[in-house]
Amino acid sequence: TAEYANTDATYKGAVAGAPASSLGKIILEVAPAALSSIEAQEIQYNIPLAARTSVDSYATLLAYAALTGVGIKAYEPRFSYQDIFQSRAKSLAEFAEGSTGDNGLCLDNDSDPSLSLINKFKDDIIQFMTANLDKKVMDYPGLDTSVFATNETVKNFLISSQPGTKRIDKPVYVIQGTADTNVPYPITQALVANLKTLGSPNITLDPVIGASHTQAIVCRNAEAVDFIQTYMSAGTGIVLTDAQKDASTNENCTGIAPT
């Protein structure tokens, strides 16, 4: 949004938590090596499939791809997003669209996990790996990477939707976990570097060491609030205490449930 707001005097700035970018590069280049490395450690420590970061992350990427495909179809009705998936995963991808185009599943559903698009893929990955004990997570027949990499409609979408290609003259605070497997840190690092190269004067990247996707955002809640109060205040006069802003002891930051 910030890229389109350079001429909008009412737009004051933006906070971005692990901004989605370079989906093609993540899926085709970064994820296979990263998830294979994580999986090797999980196997070494006998982590069950349902608790593996590698499984959850690959399911998340497949859900992203499905929602991306449905989004493309919304403006290009002739596009068949099912084609970017292998036969086993085609019906799962269709949950992103739903039966009417308006009742598709969201990435997550806290009240009913069975209605989570991520869980649809995750459950099937687990089923596949349970039935094929010699297979690794990247062996799951999910995305058809050759079609994804060469389909002209997909390629055009990834180029046109890529953020960080225009100078931004408003302050931007970017929070990024260095252990994020959904949006890897090097991807966001390159995004921020490019924005600075384009002459964006106030872009701050805050790497949260060892933090995952959502974890990083929770851990930097106080910093995000301070940034918003500094640059994007609504002028309500409400002032939060440090204790109210700080979420560093929250279990979603520490990873430790309260006892």
Residue ranges and their predicted role:
Residues 1-6:
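Short glycine-enriched nucleophile-adjacent loop
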Residues 17-165:
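Accessory cap/linker subdomain of secreted extracellular hydrolases
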Residues 12-17, 22, 171-176, 204-207:
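Structural recognition of the beta-strand scaffold that forms the well-ordered cores
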Residues 147-151, 165, 181-184, 217, ...:
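Solvent-exposed, acidic/flexible segments
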Residues 142-145, 177-181:
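Second-shell loop/turn segments in exported
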Residues 158, 168, 173-180:
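Short beta-strand/loop motif that positions the catalytic acidic residue
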Residues 7-8, 164-168:
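Extracellular/periplasmic catalytic domains that process cell-envelope and extracellular macromolecules
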